[in-house]
């Protein structure tokens, strides 16, 4: 939950917590553990600013500046103090700011050193009031090793428990390329830093507000993407938590038209935010797992439900040796153990508990809405199974499956879809 400073303090010294009280009470009623981001400037103390780029200024409008001067810092720490004192009996996990490396959410050109200073004095205040608190910092838009290095150089890493990131895009696997440098930076400050992926999702339709990918949207695409994201985060990115954004949205299906007048290529393609990704500030965020307005579950909702039913934190990341062979590529033309194929073969994420193993595999193509001709692959893996089952996490269907055990601790599965 993002607790925005300027939403709770609209008059100096006067706080309205009612919406957050309602949300937190509902979460706790269902034994859901919340983590809260204290975030956003407040124009009464900090002033406001916007992008230099007129297109982005038209999309985002003005945002409060970050609380970096004496006046802003004093107001911010009063807000932090009030929030922590109010909720410390209900909240243990506190995150410092939402996406400080994003111009709109930071409120000014991103500055890792400035964010690090804000983390330093915010964390000191939280721990003074709530010594048992768990501190989350980073909350970056994307995975930025450089930004991480800058902010950790200005605060005390020993007082931070978790570093978090948010990573969108039409292929969850793309985030893997940034993780190695990111982890090296973390280890240089504190080996063993816990990593969370705190926010990310994909729209079930090409019409959405908020960030959108450049790929097509669809209900099945969303479900497949959600599952792939979960395994990419917890296996390839070493995250101990992978969060999906979001459950529901209360935006308007037919928002008012903006006053923007596109020019140049934008006349044909719309107004791109960046990299061809269009942005509308109002409407429905179609990344939600419940349809708008009736809130019926989408396929991704059930996929997430199936995943959470199938595994939990008893399973730990494992690294068994394995090899896929493509027997029939189906509609996925060109896959196989070829040097010039990308992606070539499925990926594997492996987890083990005290008495079981969980293997997830998928082909890292851009997700397809419809698959009419599945590929067939074989898997050799250094994990032993007594009674293996094959589960389709999209549908929840479970199937018996044959396994060959050529030797102790090894399994071979043939003709997997």
Per-region residue spans from a language model:
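Aromatic/acidic polysaccharide-binding cleft in carbohydrate-active enzymes
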Residues: 208-214, 219-333
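C-terminal beta-strand-rich structural cap/linker in extracellular carbohydrate-active enzymes
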Residues: 402-417
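N-terminal substrate-binding region of glycoside hydrolase catalytic domains
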Residues: 1-82, 95, 101, 412
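Solvent-exposed beta-hairpin/edge-strand motifs
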Residues: 378-399
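Solvent-exposed loop/turn segments at secondary-structure junctions
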Residues: 3-7, 40-44, 98-103, 140-144, ...
């Amino acid at each position: 939950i993002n607790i925005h400073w300027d939403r709770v303090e609209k008059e100096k010294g006067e706080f309205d917590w009612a919406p957050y009280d309602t949300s937190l009470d509902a979460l706790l009623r269902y034994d859901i553990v919340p983590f809260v981001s204290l975030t956003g400037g407040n124009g009464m103390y900090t002033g406001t600013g916007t992008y230099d780029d007129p297109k982005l200024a038209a999309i985002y409008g003005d945002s409060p500046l970050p609380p970096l001067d004496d006046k802003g810092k004093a107001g911010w720490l009063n807000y932090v103090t009030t929030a922590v004192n109010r909720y410390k009996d209900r909240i243990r996990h506190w995150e410092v700011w939402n996406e400080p490396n994003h111009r709109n959410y930071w409120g000014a050109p991103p500055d890792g050193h400035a964010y690090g200073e804000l983390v330093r004095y915010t964390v000191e205040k939280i721990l003074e009031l709530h010594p048992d608190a768990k501190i989350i910092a980073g909350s970056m838009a994307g995975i930025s090793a450089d930004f991480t290095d800058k902010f950790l150089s200005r605060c005390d890493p020993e007082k931070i428990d978790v570093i978090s990131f948010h990573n969108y895009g039409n292929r969850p696997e793309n985030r893997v390329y940034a993780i190695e440098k990111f982890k090296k930076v973390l280890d240089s400050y504190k080996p063993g830093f816990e990593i969370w992926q705190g926010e990310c999702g994909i729209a079930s339709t090409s019409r959405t507000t908020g960030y959108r990918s450049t790929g097509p949207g669809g209900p099945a695409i969303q479900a497949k993407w959600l599952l792939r994201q979960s395994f990419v985060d917890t296996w390839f990115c070493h995250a101990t938590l992978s969060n999906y954004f979001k459950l529901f949205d209360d935006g308007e299906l037919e928002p008012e038209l903006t006053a923007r007048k596109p020019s140049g290529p934008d006349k044909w393609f719309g107004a791109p935010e960046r990299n061809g990704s269009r942005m509308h500030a109002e409407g429905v965020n179609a990344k939600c797992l419940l349809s708008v307005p009736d809130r019926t579950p989408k396929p991704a909702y059930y996929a997430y439900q199936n995943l959470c039913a199938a595994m939990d934190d008893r399973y730990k990341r494992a690294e068994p040796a394995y090899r896929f062979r493509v027997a029939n590529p189906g509609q996925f033309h060109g896959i196989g153990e070829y040097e010039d194929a990308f992606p070539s073969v499925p990926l594997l994420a492996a987890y083990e508990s005290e008495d079981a193993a969980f293997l997830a595999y998928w082909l890292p193509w851009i997700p397809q809405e419809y698959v009419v001709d599945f590929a067939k692959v074989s898997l050799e893996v250094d994990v032993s199974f007594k009674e293996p089952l094959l589960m389709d996490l999209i549908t929840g269907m479970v199937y018996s499956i044959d396994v060959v055990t050529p030797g102790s601790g090894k399994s071979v599965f043939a003709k997997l879809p």
